Amino acid sequence: MANNMKYVKELLQTDIGTEGQLLIPRKIHDTLIEAVDKNLIPRSEAALYFGPGDIPGSSIDVDLVTPNTMDIRVVGEGAESIIDQPAYTSFNMKPVKYGVAIRITSEMMEDSKWNLLQHSVMTAGKRFAENETSLILSDGLGNYGNSVTGGAAITIANITRAMQYLDDNDYTPTTLFVGMEVLNDLRNIDTFVEANKVGNTDMLQRGFLGTIYGLNVLKFSTNAAPSTTYSAYAYVTDKMHAYAIAEKRTVTIRNFDLPVNDMSAANITQRIVVKELRANAICKIITS
């Protein structure tokens, strides 16, 4: 009897004693703690958005006037004017289907502390939004016309040079997209921290400066980007000309049952594509 009591005592005093752990009362929190929402790129930054009603078939053609075409020339007295006309280009946007399927057994639905199907659908909605940001970075902003290569940290000169690339092509810089490493660099630039230089204390109070040289600063999550290397990238854009989004099917949820498998299920899909509109309206800043 004494040996048995000693064995139980040892279990209660060790981290690996399963029996001891079971004797300790535990409260299981009945509210599911959600994952934090990521910083995503809003649709308002797209120059054009084509919804399902704008795309009668499987794709849509976008027509553009080629910049700086059609010249005015000197014409001599009595001479014939030279024929010229604007040039045009066109590209096609064909939405790609993305989707995820959810299957929950009836036993899991009955025994779970929360509605697993409903929560899974809600989480899927977030993943679709994150996928859209990834597409914007890779297929929209990723097809930039010019780039600035900086050093280990972004500098003011990098930002202003990127702005100049847009100015040189007659675009108006409106937005600065920054990865998290670049955001950290901005926090360490005195010009954006000291109130007597920047005119406010936003960076000190909130750790974020919403406007730099008239650019609307938007940070994007590394975990929503195509890869972690995007954390060291920034993009200066003219939001009126940078990229377009075509969405043939909005995020669509189809609920159904699988009686043979005794499951509740949902199929969630979206048809969407992102493409640059004017490459020279985008300048990428690369840091190491």
Please place each PLM-identified region on the residue numbering.
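Short, structured patches in soluble enzyme cores that scaffold and shape functional sites
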Residues: 104-106, 180, 270
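Short helix/loop capping segments that flank catalytic or ligand/cofactor-binding pockets
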Residues: 71-73, 112-113, 185-188, 275-277
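A generic local secondary-structure boundary/capping motif
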Residues: 90-92, 163-167, 254-255
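Extended, solvent-exposed, turn-rich assembly/linker loops in the middle of proteins
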Residues: 141-209
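Assembly/oligomerization interface modules of large self-assembling protein complexes
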Residues: 25-98
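Sequence/fold signature of self-assembling virion shell proteins
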Residues: 2-13, 23-26, 89, 189-288
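Alpha-helical scaffold segments that mediate packing/assembly in large oligomeric complexes
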Residues: 103-171, 284-288
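Short, surface-exposed beta-edge/turn micro-motifs
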Residues: 29, 172-174, 263
